[in-house]
Amino acid sequence: MRVGVLGAKGKVGATMVRAVAAADDLTLSAELDAGDPLSLLTDGNTEVVIDFTHPDVVMGNLEFLIDNGIHAVVGTTGFTAERFQQVESWLVAKPNTSVLIAPNFAIGAVLSMHFAKQAARFFDSAEVIELHHPHKADAPSGTAARTAKLIAEARKGLPPNPDATSTSLPGARGADVDGIPVHAVRLAGLVAHQEVLFGTEGETLTIRHDSLDRTSFVPGVLLAVRRIAERPGLTVGLEPLLDLH
């Protein structure tokens, strides 16, 4: 399988370049960074592209890839409901093309989101804290936003988080994502970390995941690359490939 990498000179992109080059069943067909023409992907007969670029350019990348029938595995963040709808509309004309967009490709992070959804209905309170390096473009992270949405979905019909706060500085209680407070930390020395805190009378539960190195994303990305052709259309999240129930 011929695989191209967009964002190849970034920290995650460079990790993906090395991972693809080291895989016996994959061929690195192109490695592109800012300023490189996307036509290099078609020139190299690329079948699947890994995109770890920037929210400002990812939609243009996807439009090109879909138009050319190239499957896309996307780890770039900043996707909204409107952006997902746009991707789906592009895919209508290319029913055999696949796009997988995931907020996180670390297997442990995907599992932590799954565990959080399972635990959510058993606790009165839930909050999310995400911690990342200071170069991250978006806040809160896509992983934290998705985690909060999964928790809110699991708690549907239950009372909201108890919170007697009547006065606070703007932002002190975090961002409200479907009723779940999400707090973002940006700190030098961090990579990608998340805590989900649950509380009820007499006990708390903390689910924490730490990506200590960007190689933590490699197994999930390569899994998606190898299986993406099985899932025409848009897939959001890595969970469908892990057979989680």
From Swiss-Prot:
What CDD domains does UniProt report for this protein, alphabetically? DHDPR_N
Locate the residues binding NAD(+): K11, V12, D33, G75, T76, T77, A102, P103, N104, F105, K136
- What does the entry list as the binding residues for NADP(+)? K11, V12, G75, T76, T77, A102, P103, N104, F105, K136
Chief location bin = cytoplasm
Family annotation (InterPro entries): DapB_C, DapB_N, DapB_N_CS, DHDPR_bac, NAD(P)-bd_dom_sf
Q: What is its EC number?
A: 1.17.1.8
Give the UniProt entry's GO cellular component terms.
cytosol; peptidoglycan-based cell wall; plasma membrane
Instruction: Give an example GO biological process.
Output: lysine biosynthetic process via diaminopimelate
One Pfam family this sequence matches:
DapB_C
So where's the catalytic machinery, residue-wise?
A: H132 (proton donor/acceptor), K136 (proton donor)
Where on this chain does (S)-2,3,4,5-tetrahydrodipicolinate bind?
Answer: H133, G142, T143
Task: List the PROSITE patterns hit by this protein, alphabetically.
Answer: DAPB (PS01298)
Q: Which reaction does it catalyse?
A: (S)-2,3,4,5-tetrahydrodipicolinate + NAD(+) + H2O = (2S,4S)-4-hydroxy-2,3,4,5-tetrahydrodipicolinate + NADH + H(+); (S)-2,3,4,5-tetrahydrodipicolinate + NADP(+) + H2O = (2S,4S)-4-hydroxy-2,3,4,5-tetrahydrodipicolinate + NADPH + H(+)
Q: What class of enzyme is it?
A: oxidoreductase
Pathway it acts in? Amino-acid biosynthesis; L-lysine biosynthesis via DAP pathway; (S)-tetrahydrodipicolinate from L-aspartate: step 4/4
Record PANTHER family = 4-HYDROXY-TETRAHYDRODIPICOLINATE REDUCTASE 1, CHLOROPLASTIC-RELATED, DIHYDRODIPICOLINATE REDUCTASE
Entry's HAMAP family?
A: DapB
Q: What does this protein do?
A: Catalyzes the conversion of 4-hydroxy-tetrahydrodipicolinate (HTPA) to tetrahydrodipicolinate. Can use both NADH and NADPH as a reductant, with NADH being 6-fold as effective as NADPH.
State the family it belongs to. Answer: Belongs to the DapB family.
The name of this protein is 4-hydroxy-tetrahydrodipicolinate reductase
Could you read off the lineage of the organism from its UniProt record?
Answer: Bacteria, Bacillati, Actinomycetota, Actinomycetes, Mycobacteriales
